[in-house]
From Swiss-Prot:
Compartments reported by the entry: Cell inner membrane
Family: Belongs to the glycosyltransferase 28 family. MurG subfamily.
Protein's UniProt name: UDP-N-acetylglucosamine--N-acetylmuramyl-(pentapeptide) pyrophosphoryl-undecaprenol N-acetylglucosamine transferase
Coiled-coil residues: none
Membrane topology reported for the UniProt record: Peripheral membrane protein
Lineage: Bacteria, Pseudomonadati, Pseudomonadota, Gammaproteobacteria, Pasteurellales
Length: 351
């Protein structure tokens, strides 16, 4: 009997691509064939084939920040992308499509509707993006990571890597720690400039009390090392973190942005967090962070309010007992079966 096939529509950022890979891998274990639809100039083009998943491409890009010519050309570009996606769907003959966000999802979702293929949509953020708001009107089923994106959609969490759920619980990790508090600063693949410029001034005042690791992002090691100056020996600086599970396990508290995937990873491992949301006009990252801050698992510091003095005052008053309680609260908010649940819904609607 022929294997069932899923077409994944996701691209642009790790927040869209990594959860989609987790779902794809879950279905691959159940003997599903997977095909991916993306764009050639975004991260999925290099990343997805590394997981042994074939990828095909359509031409589409975002409009934010583009000039008037691009806006005038947009209807033609979208129409062309829909036709490209429709042709690929007719060739691949998937039993279902999974939309996980990114520019590619819009035209590909419309094409799937035209081809009569079930559309399962997953919104990773606490507030839905424009593409998913529109696709939500034609999707067969809508799922969401947080309870605030769609009024009636099932909340399943964000699929995150299995190794994060396999870590020891916070009370076990914290049980034999008596040395300095450990602070992990995570800027993401591009780094977070505000963290890179603020933390060196914080370490100047707290190097004798706290231990720091700082992931600074692509190409930023030299600049940030200079900012740390004579305190550089007090900090472990890296461009990327290859083993996030080990880094989270090491930390007592994590300072980071609050992208959807990051928030769900923090919950999965059970870690105390200080979130500095990126300043989207739709407050997307702030609302993601509230999911944990509302239960006392995290502190939110708005970027406009972030100063070295403020961060120093907050950090120096933390105790390991406080942080353990925050970590335990974060763990209660995790949804370890997110990838499995999304896979179940796909199977349900593909029959």
């Amino acid at each position: 009997m022929k294997n069932k096939k899923l077409l994944v529509m996701a691209g642009g950022t790790g927040g869209h691509v990594f959860p989609a890979i987790a779902v794809a891998q879950t279905l691959q274990k159940q003997e599903w064939d997977i095909c991916w639809l993306g764009t050639k100039d975004r991260m999925e083009a290099q990343l997805v084939p590394k997981y042994g998943i074939p990828i095909r491409f359509i031409q589409i890009s975002g409009l934010r920040g583009k000039g008037i010519k691009a806006l005038l050309n947009a209807p033609f570009a979208i129409f062309r992308a829909v036709l490209q996606a429709k042709k690929i769907i007719q060739e691949e003959k998937p039993d279902a499509v999974l939309g996980m966000g990114g520019y590619v999802s819009g035209p590909a979702g419309v094409a799937a509707k035209l081809c009569g293929v079930p559309i399962i949509l997953h919104e990773q953020n606490a507030i839905a993006g424009l593409t998913n708001k529109l696709l939500g009107k034609i999707a067969t089923c809508v799922l969401q990571a947080f309870p605030t994106a769609f009024p009636h959609a099932e909340v399943v969490g964000n699929p995150v890597r299995e190794d994060l759920f396999e870590m020891p619980n916070p009370d076990i990790r914290f049980s034999d720690r008596e040395e300095k508090l450990r602070v992990l600063v995570v800027g993401g693949s591009q780094g977070a400039r505000v963290l890179n410029h603020t933390l060196p001034k914080v370490v100047t005042q707290l190097a004798d009390k706290l231990e720091f690791r700082h992931q600074v992002g692509k190409g930023a090691v030299e600049e940030v090392s200079q900012l740390y100056g004579e305190n550089l020996e007090q900090v472990k600086i890296t461009e990327f973190i290859d083993n996030m599970a080990e880094a989270y396990a090491w930390a007592d508290v994590v300072i980071c942005r609050s992208g959807a995937l990051t928030v769900c990873e923090i919950a999965a491992v059970g870690a105390a967090a200080i979130f500095v949301p990126f300043q989207h006009k739709d407050r997307q990252q702030y609302l993601n962070a509230k999911y944990l801050s509302d239960v006392g698992a995290a502190k939110i510091i708005e970027q406009a309010d972030l100063t070295p003095e403020m961060l120093v005052n907050y950090l120096k008053n933390l105790t390991r007992e406080n942080l353990l309680q925050m970590a335990l609260k974060a763990k209660t908010m995790s949804m370890p079966n997110a990838a499995q649940r999304v896979a179940e819904v796909i199977k349900q609607y593909s029959n």
